[in-house]
Structures are given as structure tokens and as C-alpha cells.
Amino acid sequence: MDLLTVDKSKCLKCGICVECCPSCILSMTEEGPTCEFDRGCMACGHCVAICPVGALENKYTPLDKQRPVTKPMLDEETAYEFMRMRRSVRNFKPVMPSEEDLTKLLNITRYAPTAGNSQGMYYLVIRDAERIKAIADAVANWMEEEIEAGSPNKRYYMTVLRAYRDRGQDIIARKAPCLVFALARRLNNTGVSNAEQCWAYAELFAPTIGLGTTIA
């Protein structure tokens, strides 16, 4: 199957699909848009979404799989207040999030921007209290090693360790009932920045389903 299928009876040959393609692999001909290098497609779907008459099909983002926006868009004031209300949570209830809510939370991260639409994120969910404590202990041990190695962050690490070990305050895992790790393949050199974008989406979405989050 070709990458692009063009409905010639609809196509205006306006060229907007060519202009918006981030991979610069489309060109306009007398027959309509054509792809010069199929393997260069990042499957972002911009060419399909931007077409004003729905004349373009992309095998990676077919029109019949698109989901129309059925609810009204946020107005400026509502969107501003929604973004402004974002806050990290560092005091958690001893209540385990349901699998359904965790699935909703992780599903929303699929829509976060990633470099070159690379996506490729994986998630590890930890719900066992003993394992969470072991992870926090491992982080504390790592901080101790960093202090001994003369890390430029050693003052911060010392503050954390005093609270964690001397006062018994769980300043690392915050007694959270659940930890979620974002993972990417070793060769994915944008994995860290992709994860940060995904967590930003998750953090904004979490309060709408009654969850609190903090990013570490």
C-alpha cells in the first residue's frame, strides 16, 4: 500500500500538506501531493489533519481512525486557570489507585509531544510497599555515593539524607502507594526529554480523575 492515497475529485492542490510536513518528504504534482521517501514519514498525521477538504489518506493515520473533537474547546480563561492550578502532591493518601485510573493516566501520555513523533515510551508500575521502600533506600545510597564523590548537588543530597535517615521522613518516595517509571530504549537519545513531556501531560490530567502526582 502506498503511503498516500489522494482523492483527486476533492484535492484542491493547495499545497498546505506539503508545507506542513515536518519530514519534508511531500511534493505537489499535477495529480496532487506525492511522497518522495515513504520511510521518512514519522506518522504524525499532520498532512491528513491539515487538509481542508479531507482529500488525503496516510496509511499510518487513516481518516476512518480519526476521532473528532465532540466537546467544546476550553476558552482562554478556563484553559489559563486549568494550567495555573497545576501543583505537585507530596502527601499521599494510603489508597491504591485503581488499575482503570492508572490506565487512563498512562493512556493520556500517548498524546504528549515527542521528538520526531518517536514516542517509544514504556511504563513500569510498582505497587508493592516493600519494593517502593527498597527503591527509596537505593536512591538514598546513591545520594551518599554522590556526596562522597564531590557532586555539585551534595548540599541538596545531604539535606535529603538528614530528613530520610535521621528524622525518618520519607522525603524520597513520599509514602506514595504507587510508583510509575517512564522507560525508553537505551538507543533512544531523546528518551529523557520525551519522558518529561509525557509526565507533564500525566500531571495535568491526574486531578481530573482524582489522583495526585509528583515527578522525580
Predicted segment positions?
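Glycine/small-residue-rich phosphate/adenosyl-binding loop
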Residues: 124-195
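Iron-sulfur cluster-binding cysteine motifs and their immediate structural context
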Residues: 3, 16-32, 46-63
